[in-house]
């Protein structure tokens, strides 16, 4: 595995520190996929609304991606003197190479494409902050990632042409900005909602898995998930958001007995062919940021 020629400067970061953050990224991906039961998503119980992927695909994918996370951190450090808006172009070749390894590991199944984008951004932000001797906190990491993505939504979603991508169609039809919009805004759903919610539940002594499942419900209730909208349209997205909000209003996931509600929600998502993959990606970031 060779790193694309995207930078020439060297980094002063310790390899052990780089590997530590890369390991957290890998653990975040595994924590999310192993979390069960998750409505419509692949987990230890079933494949959710997916017929083309299984738990083992995600395990292989996460391992393949882990090998590339240090490259994102290194590029973030090496490009620390560049204008932040110029960093994204340098990250793209690394992301594409990482994506290639993911597809090879899964025999062509798209398991973690969204996480390559989001974790890649956060890892590059961490590298930049470390190189500049600035604090590495959830807020500084997300604001730095946002600076890399300035103007991204305008450039990539507001294009008018006859061959629209799925993301462009959802933006034009429903106003959903998806992963690009969340990144450009500095991951407000994570920073302002999911992360404080998760940490509060942990402080209250709730089991970590139950806390994560409840946090997933919060994300599903608030996120304009393009994965859901692409499968079920606006109606499918609004239904999923309402169902998640209803469960939260009933008390959320606080005891093992509450998992029955999630199992029923899972069955309904499978029947409707809905999978909140965008919210799953944000849950990965939530767990990752909770560790730093």
UniProtKB/Swiss-Prot annotation:
Q: Which GO terms describe its molecular function?
A: ATP binding; triphosphoribosyl-dephospho-CoA synthase activity
Origin species: Escherichia coli O127:H6 (strain E2348/69 / EPEC)
Q: Which reaction does it catalyse?
A: 3'-dephospho-CoA + ATP = 2'-(5''-triphospho-alpha-D-ribosyl)-3'-dephospho-CoA + adenine
According to UniProt, the name of this protein is 2-(5''-triphosphoribosyl)-3'-dephosphocoenzyme-A synthase
E.C. designation(s)? 2.4.2.52
- GO BP, sorted A to Z: prosthetic group biosynthetic process
Classify the source by domain of life: Bacteria
Keyword Membrane among record annotations: no
Query: Gene3D superfamilies of this UniProt entry?
Result: Triphosphoribosyl-dephospho-CoA protein
Q: Which UniProt keywords apply?
A: ATP-binding, Nucleotide-binding, Transferase
Its function, per the record, reads:
Catalyzes the formation of 2-(5''-triphosphoribosyl)-3'-dephosphocoenzyme-A, the precursor of the prosthetic group of the holo-acyl carrier protein (gamma chain) of citrate lyase, from ATP and dephospho-CoA.
As for family, the record states: Belongs to the CitG/MdcB family.
Q: Which enzyme class?
A: transferase
Q: By its UniProt entry, which NCBIfam families does this protein fall under? A: citrate_citG (TIGR03125), PRK10096.1 (NF007503)
């Amino acid at each position: 595995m060779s790193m694309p020629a995207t930078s020439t400067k060297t980094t002063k970061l310790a390899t052990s520190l780089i590997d530590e953050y890369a390991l957290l990224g890998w653990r975040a991906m595994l924590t999310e996929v192993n979390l069960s039961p998750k409505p419509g998503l692949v987990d230890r119980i079933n494949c959710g609304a997916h017929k083309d992927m299984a738990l083992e695909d995600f395990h292989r994918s996460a391992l393949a991606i882990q090998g590339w996370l240090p490259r994102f951190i290194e590029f973030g450090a090496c490009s620390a003197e560049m204008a932040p808006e110029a960093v994204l172009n340098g990250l793209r070749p690394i992301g594409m190479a990482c994506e290639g390894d993911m597809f090879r590991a899964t025999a062509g199944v798209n398991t973690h494409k969204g996480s390559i984008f989001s974790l890649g951004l956060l890892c590059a932000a961490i590298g930049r902050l470390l190189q500049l001797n600035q604090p590495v906190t959830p807020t500084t990491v997300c604001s730095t990632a946002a600076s890399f993505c300035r103007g991204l939504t305008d450039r990539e979603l507001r294009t008018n042409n006859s061959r629209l991508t799925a993301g462009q169609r959802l933006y034009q039809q429903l106003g959903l900005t998806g992963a690009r919009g969340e990144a450009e805004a500095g991951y407000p759903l994570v920073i302002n909602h999911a992360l404080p919610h998760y940490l509060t539940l942990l402080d209250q002594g709730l089991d970590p898995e139950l806390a994560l499942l409840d946090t997933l419900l919060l994300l599903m209730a608030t996120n304009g998930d393009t994965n859901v909208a692409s499968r079920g349209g606006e109606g499918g997205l609004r239904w999923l958001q309402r169902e998640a909000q209803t469960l939260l209003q009933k008390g959320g996931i606080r005891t093992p007995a509450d998992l029955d509600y999630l199992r029923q929600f899972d069955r309904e998502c499978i029947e409707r062919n809905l999978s909140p993959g965008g919210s799953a990606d944000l849950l990965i970031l939530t767990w990752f940021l909770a560790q730093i």
